[in-house]
Regions:
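Exported/periplasmic ABC-transporter solute-binding proteins
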Residues: 1-26, 33-34, 41-44, 51-56, ...
Length: 184
C-alpha cells in the first residue's frame, strides 16, 4: 500500500524505545507491555493518538548451570528469590551446596525484567542482593554456564540450539528450570 515506505530498525530496550517515541524520534515502537497511563497521556498530548495492540506473545525461561540439581521450583520460590526472602540454594533444597543465588537478567532495562517485576512481583522492585545485569541474552546464557550458583532469566526463544533445525533441542550449556504453581 505504501511502496515508498522504508523502515530503519533500532534495536534497544523498552526504556530507550519508549523515550524515543515520547521524544518523537520514532513513529513505531514494539514493546512487550501495555502503555502505562502516564505514557499514554504523554503520547496523546504530543500528537496522534497511540494505537496499541498485541501482535504476538513470548515466554520467559529460568535457566541454571548444568551442575545445579535444582531444576524444578515453584513460582512462589521465584517470587521469594526475587524479593530477597530466599538468598541461598540450600533454602530451596538443604542438599544444594551452590551457595548464594545470583539472579542474572539481560540488562537493567529489558522487557524480561519489566515482565518479572510486573507479573511475578506485582510491580514491586526486586530486592535480591545478588542481581547481575549481563549485556544481552547470550551473555546471560554464558554467565549461567560459567557460574554454578546462577539462575538466569531470558526470553524463551534463546533456549533453542542453533544446530537443531527442528528447534526442539535446548541449549546444552545450561539446564531449563521447570516452574510449578504448587509445591514441587
Amino acid at each position: 500500500r505504501y511502496p515508498e515506505t522504508h523502515l530503519l530498525p533500532i534495536y534497544t530496550d523498552d526504556n530507550k524505545g519508549m523515550q524515543l517515541l515520547l521524544d518523537q524520534k520514532v513513529n513505531l515502537f514494539f514493546t512487550s507491555h501495555a502503555l502505562t497511563k502516564g505514557e499514554d497521556a504523554m503520547l496523546r498530548e504530543k500528537g496522534p493518538i497511540p494505537a496499541v495492540f498485541p501482535i504476538g506473545y513470548d515466554g520467559i525461561a529460568f535457566i541454571v548451570n548444568n551442575t545445579n540439581a535444582d531444576s524444578c521450583i515453584t513460582v512462589t520460590d521465584v517470587k521469594k528469590i526475587l524479593s530477597g526472602q530466599i538468598a541461598k540454594w540450600n533454602q530451596l533444597n538443604p542438599k544444594n551446596d551452590k551457595g548464594n543465588i545470583e539472579v542474572v537478567f539481560d540488562n537493567k532495562a529489558s522487557a524480561t525484567l519489566h515482565y518479572v517485576v510486573d507479573s511475578i512481583l506485582g510491580g514491586k522492585n526486586i530486592k535480591s542482593a545478588n542481581i547481575v545485569a549481563a549485556n544481552n541474552s547470550k551473555s546471560v546464557i554464558d554467565y549461567v554456564h560459567k557460574t554454578p550458583n546462577a539462575i538466569g532469566v531470558i526470553g524463551s526463544n534463546w533456549l533453542n540450539d542453533h544446530r537443531d533445525s527442528t528447534n526442539t533441542t535446548f541449549k546444552k550449556d545450561i539446564r531449563v528450570v521447570g516452574l510449578s504453581k504448587t509445591t514441587v
